[in-house]
């Protein structure tokens, strides 16, 4: 009756029927066993498992291990509590059979812990330490049995696992099958922040399986993960996401964990013994899934409220504890203190009152001089740190504005209130503007482009020999958000303010093409500097070889064999001396030693200045050279706004070719106006309007600089921003009419044609905006060549720009030439220019390519059968011959056949009629 009442209490009626069925079937099972005894039954199960595992332990040791290690997370717990825990699991299992959607599924983040680098290192180190101690123990026992000595072999003392753990910690590369922080190369300052906050969920098996549901945005990720900064394509879609701005990951040491566990257990056991022993109809209290007590249902709400208050007051010495009240027939209080949990702060609602509103006057007076930790100490009940499980089972109001508008009866239903919507985005998404005013895909594309934006200079750019691209004259953005300001991303700038105009320019700026002003480029507009590392390893004998070689590549080297500082390297120049010498085995040659240059060359299309040279002398000479190059915008370079309005330079126009306004101001960049409508980026227009408003009123009433807050996600209407801009222009130009003020507010400007000096018939949208330059540079991607290196096997051009390869001329390009009838060009491109042609002899009997034996062409297949062969010479490419040979080696016969017809000189000549045709 106890089991029946415990499993069916506060459950739907259909579950009660199933519980009765389970109990009755168990009774019937017991009746079938003669003289049933529970101890004997369990003992038989252990013996059966012992025989199944073929354990090397004796039976008593195996039995002791099985019983003691049952439910290992409750190892020190009495067996009675273990039994109650099994009943709680059975209760949840039965409930989830009927109501599968009520409890977190496999893909819910409630069921996941993020494995950070430190935690992974700790797991590897613990496992290796256990193996290390176990190996030493086993070796001592074996040596004592065999030789009677207590010695340890030297190979047992090696620690390859520790070496693997430390190398993984330093390199950030553990096994790919575990979800953990991800690492990438850093191209900009933004990636230093965004990449460590990128979390992967699932192992590699998910990427190749047909599991599409796990790639969807799971509801449990709301408020803790950025919904915008996700991969838009590739195998990582839906499997990797960024933490939101306020989200962090818990971390706790073992000694802190044990101390905190002891404090919480003492607090729970401070309740009356009868109130925490309701194992039949009470609420189970678990601490990290370990059953502690079962609480009186009448005390549940008061217990949770009191526990949360004590937690906020730091009674337990830890503010990151998660306490979750699971109602809905589950009847469980879950307390979590472990590491790897996702946590973030929320505003506290107590009995229908927002605590922040009650102490607002006192908090507002001190807020300028307080940090987040100070608020938690002085006003502990304002903010609560909540983990993702507590958030899932709590009633959370999405904004303060919505909560204040609710009636009192509705307010009492909520436990927590969220911060403004911009803090649900990640750091990358928070650098965008007005995501909620644009179409959905713009946010995802904007995050991807924002990571590619070139940021400001590093502090040690000249001494750090590494690849990097840096903006020379960065500017702090005027339109920012709270997240952008507090994270210091705004201070570490990533773009410049430029004047743009939305118009068509002679049909040049079609699609993504933009027009950029030549004088803007010459004055350093969006100018960058490229730092590039060139590293070579040279054998010591080659580096010290003083033999002279006829090579113009050594013109920039000094006498020590290294490139000169401040030398300008061009394509083909050597980085360092590398001369290989070889002795010819020929007694008739007086000078039988030849030397040739095998040095690594500088391969970039543009000249670069040598900034630093480092040399490491070991068994090989390791030379590292840092080169610098100023890179002004050129045709094909890529730019974008913060609303994912990307564009490439289609034309660099002189200012005499550009239109101008009544003040003579000319746009720095001209963008295709139709891109706004096709991509639906309304927030780009709002950003221009707000930046223009800052231009006329950059200071507040106290005379201090006043950036404009236009966050990535917000609940403010567009009319509010337009009214703000209108007031700024009205204060600056009080005498203008409403129409003129509206023109200035909406950045509608009359531009004049530079050729006729007459105004255009319609007004042009022109104003300032924060513009970004991306790391996709034309000169870094040009791979056209007409001659160069070839591969040894197939004698075709190398693949890849770094290896001196060119653009592949493939099937589609060939089809274009066929359409033009350019037969000779096809022959030259596909056969003569880049490949080695080869004459081969083919046997007309079997179609095999002949072999050359002692200078004679022989068909091996026909010669073994003593057949007479007819060999035909075929002019083909070397790669075709290699392909046929490899197919034959794999057991695939490729037969070359010829058209059966007589040669042309055997054809009878046409009869020529010599009679005169005028008769």
Curated annotation (Swiss-Prot):
UniProt-listed InterPro entries: DNA-dir_RNA_pol_su2, DNA-dir_RNAP_su2_dom, DNA-dir_RNAP_su2_hyb_sf, RNA_pol_132_poxvirus, RNA_pol_bsu_CS, RNA_pol_Rpb2_3, RNA_pol_Rpb2_5, RNA_pol_Rpb2_7
Q: EC number(s) on record?
A: 2.7.7.6
Give the enzyme's main class according to its UniProt record, as a single word.
transferase
Residue spans crossing the bilayer: none
Its domain of life reads Viruses
The record's Pfam families line, in alphabetical order, gives: RNA_pol_Rpb2_3, RNA_pol_Rpb2_5, RNA_pol_Rpb2_6, RNA_pol_Rpb2_7, rpo132
Any idea what this protein is called? DNA-directed RNA polymerase 132 kDa polypeptide
Organism, by scientific name, is Sheeppox virus (strain KS-1) (SPPV)
Per the record, the gene is RPO132
């Amino acid at each position: 009756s106890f089991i029946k009442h415990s499993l069916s209490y506060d459950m739907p009626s259909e579950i009660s029927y199933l519980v009765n069925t389970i109990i009755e079937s168990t009774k019937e099972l017991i009746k079938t066993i003669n003289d049933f005894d529970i101890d004997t039954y369990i003992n038989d199960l252990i013996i059966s498992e012992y025989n199944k595992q073929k354990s090397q332990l004796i039976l008593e040791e195996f039995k002791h291990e099985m019983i003691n290690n049952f439910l290992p997370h409750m190892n020190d717990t009495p067996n009675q509590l273990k039994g109650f825990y099994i009943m709680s699991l059975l209760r949840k299992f039965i409930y989830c059979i009927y109501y599968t959607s009520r409890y977190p599924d496999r893909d819910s983040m409630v069921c996941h812990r993020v494995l950070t680098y430190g935690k992974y290192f700790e797991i590897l180190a613990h496992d290796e330490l256990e193996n290390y101690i176990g190996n030493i123990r086993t070796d001592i026992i074996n040596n004592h049995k065999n030789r009677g000595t207590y010695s340890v072999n030297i190979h047992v003392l090696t620690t390859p696992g520790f070496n693997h753990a430390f190398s993984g910690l330093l390199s950030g590369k553990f096994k790919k099958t575990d979800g953990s922080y991800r690492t990438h190369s850093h191209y900009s300052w933004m990636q230093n922040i965004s990449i460590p906050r990128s979390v992967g969920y699932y192992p590699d098996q998910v990427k190749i399986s047909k599991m599409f549901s796990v790639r969807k945005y799971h509801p449990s990720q709301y408020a803790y993960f950025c919904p915008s900064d996700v991969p838009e394509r590739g195998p990582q879609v839906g499997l990797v996401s960024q933490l939101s701005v306020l989200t962090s990951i818990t971390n706790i040491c073992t000694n802190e964990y044990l101390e905190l566990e002891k404090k919480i257990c003492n607090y729970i056991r401070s309740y009356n013994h009868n109130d925490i022993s309701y194992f039949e109809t009470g609420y189970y209290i678990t601490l990290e899934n370990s059953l502690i007590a079962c609480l009186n249902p009448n005390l549940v709400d008061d217990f949770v409220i009191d526990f949360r208050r004590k937690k906020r007051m730091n009674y337990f010495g830890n503010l990151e504890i998660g306490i979750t009240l699971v109602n809905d027939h589950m009847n469980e209080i879950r307390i979590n203190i472990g590491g790897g949990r996702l946590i973030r702060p929320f505003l506290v609602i107590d009995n229908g009152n927002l605590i922040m509103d009650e102490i607002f006057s006192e908090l507002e007076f001190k807020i300028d001089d307080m940090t987040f930790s100070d608020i938690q100490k002085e006003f502990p009940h304002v903010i609560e740190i909540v983990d993702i499980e507590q958030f899932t089972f709590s009633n959370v109001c999405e904004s303060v504005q919505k909560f204040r508008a609710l009636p009192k009866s509705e307010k009492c239903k909520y436990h927590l209130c969220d911060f403004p919507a911009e803090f649900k985005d990640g750091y990358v998404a928070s650098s965008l503007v007005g995501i909620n005013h644009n179409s959905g895909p713009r946010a995802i594309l904007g995050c991807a482009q924002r990571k590619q934006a070139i940021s400001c200079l590093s502090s040690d750019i000249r001494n750090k020999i590494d690849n990097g691209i840096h903006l020379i004259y960065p500017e702090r953005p005027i339109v920012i958000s709270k997240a952008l300001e507090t994270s210091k991303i705004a201070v570490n700038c990533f773009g410049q303010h430029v004047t743009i105009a939305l118009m068509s320019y002679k049909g040049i700026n079609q699609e993504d093409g933009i027009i950029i002003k030549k004088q803007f480029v010459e004055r350093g507009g969006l100018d960058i500097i490229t730092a590039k590392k060139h590293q070579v390893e040279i054998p010591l004998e080659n580096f010290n070889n003083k033999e002279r070689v006829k090579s113009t590549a050594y013109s920039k080297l000094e006498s020590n064999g290294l490139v000169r500082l401040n030398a300008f390297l061009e394509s083909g120049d050597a980085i360092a001396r590398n001369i290989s010498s070889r002795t010819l085995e020929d007694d008739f040659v007086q000078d039988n030693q030849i030397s040739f240059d095998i040095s690594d060359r500088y391969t970039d299309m543009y000249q670069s200045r040598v900034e630093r040279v480092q040399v490491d002398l070991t068994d090989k000479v390791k030379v590292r050279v840092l080169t610098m190059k100023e890179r002004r915008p050129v045709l094909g370079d890529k730019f974008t706004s913060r609303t994912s309005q990307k564009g490439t330079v289609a034309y660099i126009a002189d200012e005499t070719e550009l239109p101008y306004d009544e003040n003579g101001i000319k746009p720095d960049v001209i963008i295709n106006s139709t891109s706004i409508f096709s991509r639906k980026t309304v927030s780009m227009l709002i950003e221009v309007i707000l930046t223009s408003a800052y231009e006329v009123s950059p200071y507040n009433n106290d005379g201090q600089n006043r950036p404009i807050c236009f966050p990535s996600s917000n609940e403010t209407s567009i009319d509010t921003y337009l009214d703000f801009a209108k007031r700024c222009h009205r204060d600056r130009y009080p005498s203008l009419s409403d129409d003129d003020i509206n023109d200035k507010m909406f950045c509608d400007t009359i531009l004049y044609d530079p050729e006729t000096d007459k105004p255009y018939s319609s007004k042009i949208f022109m104003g300032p905006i924060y513009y970004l330059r991306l790391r996709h540079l034309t000169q870094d991607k040009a791979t056209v060549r007409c001659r160069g290196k070839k591969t040894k096997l197939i004698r075709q051009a190398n693949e890849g720009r770094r290896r001196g390869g060119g653009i592949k001329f493939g099937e589609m390009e060939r089809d274009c030439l066929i359409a033009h009838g350019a037969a000779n060009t096809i022959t030259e491109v596909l056969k003569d220019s880049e490949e080695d042609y080869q004459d081969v002899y083919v046997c007309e009997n079997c179609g095999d390519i002949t072999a050359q034996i002692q200078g004679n062409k022989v068909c091996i297949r026909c010669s073994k059968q003593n057949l007479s062969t007819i060999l035909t010479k075929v002019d083909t490419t070397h790669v075709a011959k290699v392909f046929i040979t490899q197919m034959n080696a794999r057991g695939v016969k490729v037969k070359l056949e010829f058209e059966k017809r007589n040669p042309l000189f055997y054809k009878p000549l046409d009869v020529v009629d010599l009679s005169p045709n005028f008769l």
